[in-house]
Amino acid sequence: MPSNMKQFCKISVWLQQHDPDLLEIINNLCMLGNLSAAKYKHGVTFIYPKQAKIRDEIKKHAYSNDPSQAIKTLESLILPFYIPTPAEFTGEIGSYTGVKLEVEKTEANKVILKNGEAVLIPAADFKPFPDRRLAVWIMESGSMPLEGPPYKRKKEGGGNDPPVPKHISPYTPRTRIAIEVEKAFDDCMRQNWCSVNNPYLAKSVSLLSFLSLNHPTEFIKVLPLIDFDPLVTFYLLLEPYKTHGDDFLIPETVLFGPTGWNGTDLYQSAMLEFKKFFTQITRQTFMDIADTATKEVDVPICYSDPETVHSYANHVRTEILHHNMVNKVTTPNLVVQAYNELEQTNTIRHYGPIFPESTINALRFWKKLWQDEQRFVIHGLHRTLMDQPTYETSEFAEIVRNLRFSRPGNNYINELNITSPAMYGDKHTTGDIAPNDRFAMLVAFINSTDFLYTAIPEEKVGGNDTQTSSLTDLVPTRLHSFLNHNLSKLKILNRAQQTVRNILSNDCLNQLKHYVKHTGKNEILKLLQD
């Protein structure tokens, strides 16, 4: 029988010796990576619950229909810091949940917390390899806090809040908001994968709330375009890197100035409020805002019957992919024809009006096709980011770089890199992505819910949509953390994310990554690291 280890390269090895059942639960919840020092810049500390009651509760919830409580409890036991002794239990520290730990008392070999009243002692038999920033503590009594004020990670060489870099040109109010959100997202991803607060979610909800309260006609214009991924919604609504033209989806006068939004946070429960916006995609919402008392108004079908819009889009999809000539010439032209019909006549297969007049007017001149290709690319890159075992700023920088330099929205038709027929002509040569790979992405785009996209109320998502199949294995546990650990609030977002992602194979995602890496510039990585 093998002897027990005396030094440890991993916390999981120590757990295997002391509590293999708990280790199995952590593994089954796809959380082993959370115990790896490589994931965190400042090492990692695990709080082992000595109390059988806590471990039994974790087990009960882990193997229930809703494991979110087990995940949250386990995350409260993981600190993204290397804390080997009570002397290091100081300053701004917290658990993987993002909750700040308030220390009541430290002794030579003991720490007592205020919130949760946990009594912690270092594990006497845990000695990490010299090059591993790992620590294990034993929780003798009490519990780790699941709720409370967040902690702020201190930056090396400066204060808690790094200044927003000013060296970007042009530096517009839209750009300023985007940079602040990107830096906040990068910070919280490095802390806890944004499990406590998602900056993209917060800003998207705030902007939509502002429009709903102060500019209802703008609100009904943009509502059919919002996406279940807050990151996608944020960039499509704000268009922060557009530097040419004045055809913004939301005018400058609405967003900025004495009575403008100006990036103000306007939310109480971002997740619940974000979900509510999708439930407002109804006939009644449109009629309440449109001046139906003084003029006759056709209710757009995206409001009156959004499920049928998706059905007609699916007919177009089927026609394109079952055409007797699916190739690099015919297929992209059929895609363009479908979007041209929508942009010019506000119909899909002569069925319409699909969007409010204000919406379709804002989407002409290839903007609708540009938007939907943008959705597709960001969804793919975002999934790749969230599926990584460890977070790297460089991976997120690829997304930002693509948005800033390859798809800013300055020339919609020239920025089409997957759907444009020009990309498949004999005379077109490009070093960024092979033609066959590009065509594979085009087919994947047609198969996705990003094709001829319209937002759909939450009760319709994943219902009768023919694209939706067995999807539960496609949503990683970390995505739950990224959005929120309240599973009941997440149901709508999870279902929508699954629908979007079903068609994105790993090969397609790798092609997207390759494409982005070879287009754009390196300034974004430098920007995020400043």
Swiss-Prot record:
Keyword flag Nuclease: no
GO CC annotations on file: host cell perinuclear region of cytoplasm; virion component
TM stretches of this protein: none
Residues of the site described as Cleavage: 158-159, 463-464
UniProt KW keywords: Disulfide bond, Host cytoplasm, Late protein, Ubl conjugation, Virion
Upregulating conditions: Expressed in the late phase of the viral replicative cycle.
UniProt keyword Membrane, yes or no: no
Similarity comment text for this entry: Belongs to the asfivirus polyprotein pp62 family.
Name assigned to this protein: Polyprotein pp62
